[in-house]
Amino acid sequence: AMVGNLLVIVNDNEKQQYIAAFDKQTGKQVWRTNRSLGNKGMQSGWVTPFVWRHALRTEIVTVGPNVAVSYDLAGKELWRLAGMCPAPIPMPFAYDGLLYIDGGRGSSMFAVRPGAAGDISLAKEESSNAHVVWSQPRAGTYLPSPVAYEGGVYTLTETGILSRFEAKTGKLTYKTRIDPAATAFTTSPWAYNGKLFCLSEEGQTFVIAAGEKFQLLHVNALDEMAQATPAIVGERLLVRTESRLYSIRRAK
């Protein structure tokens, strides 16, 4: 992740876990902080650090094995939240004043308010506390990262189960299989123009109406394997499949 003049990386593996910042111009290490993530199961993580800018400060949020940890721009730990899976993959993100953390397959989804400090982990039987606005047990996903859009947070499992939660409260508004024939999803969903888009590994893009009720509008087929999340660049959507790179824009 880039923040100011710093390139920040997280290195969580079976031998060591640390976060480090490097000068983006020279490559010189500016600081390094070793991470204590516990000793349960795997020690490897896959989540890119997320720079959370809000009114109180700028934080570097990391999601690692078993725990999420936030740091200030000097590498000092600000807070930590237990409850992640042993090898999380989905990216955290900010939306409408809150931080959203997908703890990975089999774990919870969390919404965190700005200003947290210390250990903000939920006690047993708790679903919220002074810093965690809400949590949803077993709402975490394996590969795709969630997306927030028009008041909803959407999660997609690798097997094609789409769920929508109210962003402010965590209330589940629906949970459904997108299509009986679509059972493999690696890419993260994206949204614009009142619609949600989910691209399957088979190259089918399922277009779903944004809102509290599930409505599949149509399906676009590329007829080739797709495992990379598309990127929105200006008015274009870039989609990479097994052998092609597509640049798609709305017809004028």
How would you describe each model-predicted region?
Residues 1-252:
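Noncatalytic, solvent-exposed loop/strand surfaces
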